[in-house]
């Protein structure tokens, strides 16, 4: 039987212009993302900056109006963005599904093969 989940291959958020010099744990207002490093984004959630790893090959990139965080190589136990809650991605070896639950990626299924097509995660037992 095939199990399907929505894929969260990348996180897209608003670019916050006041993001310079911010660190995880610092206070913030509203919501959105900034790139702290090439492989790390910060998300303003609940009035506090929280780290979100961007382990995929595209890392964390800021454009004129958005921040893109490539989460395609993130691991179980990594933080995930609030916009990814309930969504999944394939583990980097293609043998499991990771799903964002309460702000943390959890391994939810083992697979012989996991693929993402058109935003849909398919896990073959």
What are these regions (language model features)?
Residues 1-10:
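Bacterial N-terminal signal peptides that target proteins for export
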Residues 17-19:
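C-terminal motif of bacterial Sec signal peptides marking the signal peptidase cleavage site
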Residues 21-125:
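Cysteine-rich, disulfide-bonded extracellular modules and peptides in secreted proteins
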């Amino acid at each position: 039987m095939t199990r399907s989940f929505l894929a969260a291959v990348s996180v897209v958020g608003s670019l916050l212009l006041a993001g310079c010099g911010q660190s995880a744990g610092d206070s913030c207002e509203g919501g959105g993302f900034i790139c702290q490093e090439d492989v790390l984004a910060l998300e303003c959630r609940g009035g506090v900056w929280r780290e979100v790893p961007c382990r995929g090959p595209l890392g964390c990139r800021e454009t004129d109006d958005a921040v893109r965080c490539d989460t395609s190589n993130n691991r179980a136990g990594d933080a995930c963005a609030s916009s990814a809650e309930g969504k999944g991605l394939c583990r980097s070896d293609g043998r499991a599904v990771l799903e964002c639950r309460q702000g943390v990626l959890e391994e939810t299924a083992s697979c012989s093969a996991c693929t993402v097509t058109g935003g849909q995660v398919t896990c073959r037992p």
